[in-house]
């Protein structure tokens, strides 16, 4: 996953390459334990969120659009937001995210 992120986003800060990979694994664990539905485990949504961040959208809003909003249940969305907040600051900007 880290290799894919580096290929798609060569200018992504290496610290955040690792954090996004770990975020995906965290969501995968939540899916495996049936805490959240598999709809939230969407690699394409994460890549799209990174593209939005590159264009200037704050990380929290971009990840909401790309991942969190795929879940319809508000409790499930809360679990997803908590997993995201543990890895990625909501106000993270493109200037800090990309080199």
What are these regions (language model features)?
Residues 1-99:
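C-terminal regulatory/interaction module of P-loop NTP-utilizing enzymes
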């Amino acid at each position: 996953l880290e290799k894919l992120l580096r290929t798609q986003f060569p200018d992504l800060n290496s610290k955040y390459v690792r954090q996004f990979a770990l975020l995906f694994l965290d969501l995968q664990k939540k899916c495996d334990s049936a805490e959240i539905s598999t709809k939230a485990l969407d690699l394409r949504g994460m890549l799209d969120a990174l593209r939005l961040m590159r264009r200037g959208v704050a990380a929290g809003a971009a990840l909401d659009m790309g991942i969190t909003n795929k879940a319809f249940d508000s409790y499930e969305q809360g679990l997803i937001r908590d997993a995201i907040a543990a890895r990625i600051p909501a106000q993270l900007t493109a200037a800090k995210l990309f080199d």
